[in-house]
Amino acid sequence: MKKLSSALLVAALSVAMVLPVFAAPSPQATAKPSVAVTTTTTKAAPTAAEAKATEAKANATVAVAGADVKVLPVAVMDAVEDVVENTTHLKNLGVSSAAKLAAAFDLKIEIPAGQTSVSVPIKVNNAKVGDYAVILHRRADGQWEKVGEGFLGADMTVTGTFTSFSPVAIMVVDAAQASAAGVKAPKTGEF
């Protein structure tokens, strides 16, 4: 009798264990797309108060005499983040890997008639004397270029020579890291 009850118990438990599998919904097979799909993440548009606070922060970060300085749209800010967070891009531009983004803004100034470029001194308010600043400019073709660099003096300015105006990113290397990171003085080539 023990053997019979054991066999019935084993059979009942075996059936009981299998039944939930039949009750579960069948997994859906997903078809692979025939073309590559690129996805992008989008950021929510800032509220009016956030936009005003961001613009005030940008104006407090840099000062450009006689220029129109505006906060960058989200899509352009994403492009700024892509270049400043990619060490290969920075290396190709001749920017130290120790550089940190200090400011990003859209710069508009009229280039005087008959001139192909204009030098613009930019005051960097969120750095300190002795820090090394680099000005990056996004050209119309979407590529970034270095348009100015130098150690910040008492006036806290670095000058860039622009042939066109559009998004600008200011990268700063802390004074203590400048020589350790291999930052050379642009005119003398010295560390």
Regions found by a protein language model. Give the residues of each.
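Self-processing/autoproteolytic domain segments and adjacent N-terminal interaction modules in large
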Residues: 50-113
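Short beta-strand segments and strand-loop junctions that repeat across beta-rich extracellular domains
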Residues: 132-143, 167-171
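Sec-dependent signal peptide cleavage junction
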Residues: 6, 15-31, 183-191
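Positively charged n-region of N-terminal signal peptides that target proteins for export
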Residues: 1-11
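Solvent-exposed serine/threonine-rich low-complexity stretches and specific carbohydrate-binding patches
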Residues: 107, 146-154
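C-terminal beta-strand-rich structural cap/linker in extracellular carbohydrate-active enzymes
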Residues: 159-182
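Proteolytic processing hotspots in large secreted/extracellular or virion-associated proteins
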Residues: 26-29, 90-134, 139
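Low-complexity, acidic Ser/Thr/Pro-rich repeat tracts that form intrinsically disordered stalk/linker regions
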Residues: 23-64
